Regions:
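Active-site neighborhoods and metal-handling regions in enzymes and metal-associated proteins
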Residues: 1-398
Length: 398
């Protein structure tokens, strides 16, 4: 049976692991402001805004959410891990939220305790937020940097997380198929993206049934091009293009799919019409670099080794000057997360790490060429979770 979220048991194990780390570090509580970290530990997903919110995990005591009143009724609908909810009306308010947070922590018996935190300001600081640091409101408490605690826990995925990523990859292949099918001469890439997103999302919901909902995205599937059409495909982080799709274009499609808040990444370079000799050469070198990366994935290899493998292919082809980014990055709850497949990162690959593999080359005024696959590092080497065709014939749109 397919699960659509992390089990309550796994959330409880994560909390227990946090408390063991707190005890070892002689800390009395963990105070978190990062919404992704809160979701990772509790399964509670909310829209993070200028309004401060925090999760407090005491060594002994109730796991408590501090936040705006508009979240009070939302918390119990999403999780049973959070045991207490304490709220203020709104930001900035007649009394600033951080003053409320200081009072809440005093009531929890933490006013003079040692707490690990990801923000000594006491808030994530989004959307123009301003406020006195929590450390100045609770001068007798000691706040210690624990910003890497949750990211380090997230690095190696559990069996439940891997299962969610596998399911995400399955639906990404469907969405990429629709993106490719809907490309037409004179079409606006946004219209194609919306059509593919809508159809893939509808099929996904109908197939998975009433219990499925996306947990960290507005739509189950997000499929599109971000304006990476023709010459704009040479801009890796393009956001839009003023023109429509036409014959001869190189097109880069991207897909993510939310399963339990986790998402794979699938990207494919497509060519609309018969490829030119130059397009064919650039495309094939990019695929060769990708294959070199796949061969390099193995336990004990460094993240930098993957990047070096693709750089070597591009250098041999005379394309080193067309590289604009490293080979990949971690995947899971966020579109980009550690580890980085970068020449400057000598961190060792470990079984259970999931990353994107996306070497690319980009010539300004001509085109960009990049596929991205989601790769699970295993004891045997690596497993491709996304499996959409990568060859030029399959990705040529006639």
């Amino acid at each position: 049976m397919v699960r659509f979220s992390i089990s309550e048991g796994e959330y409880k194990r994560r909390i227990e692991r946090v408390r063991k780390i707190l005890a070892k570090g002689k800390l009395d509580a963990l105070y978190l402001t990062n919404a992704t970290s809160m979701f990772y530990l509790t399964g509670y997903s909310f829209i993070s805004t200028e309004r401060p919110a925090a999760l407090v995990i005491p060594l002994d005591g109730k796991i408590t959410f501090l936040g705006p009143l508009l979240e009070k009724d939302h918390v119990p609908l999403e999780t049973r891990i959070i045991e207490d909810v304490r709220t203020y009306l709104d930001y900035p308010g007649e009394k600033h939220p951080i003053k409320y947070f200081a009072e809440f922590l005093k009531e929890m018996g933490l006013a003079r305790k040692r707490m690990g935190t990801d923000s000594k300001a006491g808030a994530s600081g989004m959307w123009g937020y301003k406020g006195q640091p929590l450390t100045k409101e609770l001068r007798e408490a000691k706040f210690l940097d624990a910003g890497e605690l949750i990211p380090s826990m997230r690095l190696v995925k559990s069996e439940e997380e891997i299962a969610l990523m596998r399911e995400s990859a399955k639906w990404a292949n469907l969405a990429q198929t629709l993106l490719q099918e809907y490309v037409a001469d004179g079409s606006w890439d946004v219209e194609v993206a919306l059509a593919a997103t809508q159809e893939a999302s509808a099929i996904m919901k109908k197939t998975l049934g009433p219990e499925y909902v996306p947990l960290r995205s507005t739509y189950p599937v997000n499929a599109g091009f971000r304006g990476q059409i023709g010459e704009m495909s040479a801009i890796p982080h393009s956001t839009a293009t003023p023109r429509t799709i036409r014959k001869g274009d190189v097109i880069i499609g991207e897909v993510t799919v939310d399963i339990g808040g986790y998402s794979c990444e699938l990207e494919r370079t497509m060519i609309f019409g018969k490829p030119t000799t130059k397009q064919r050469r650039y495309f094939n070198v990019m695929v060769e670099a990708m294959e070199a990366a796949f061969r390099t994935f193995k336990l004990g290899a460094k993240c930098s080794d993957i990047d070096k493998a693709t750089i070597a292919v591009f250098k041999k082809a005379g394309f080193a000057h067309l590289v604009k980014h490293h080979t990949g990055h971690g995947l899971g709850l966020e579109g980009h997360e550690p580890p980085w497949l970068d020449v400057g990162n000598d961190e060792l690959l470990r079984s259970g790490i999931i990353v994107s593999c996306e070497p690319g080359i980009y010539e300004t005024g001509f085109a960009g060429f990049r596929h991205s696959d989601t790769v699970l590092v295993t004891e045997e080497g690596a497993e491709l979770l996304t499996y959409y065709p990568r060859d030029l014939e399959s990705l040529t749109i006639s």
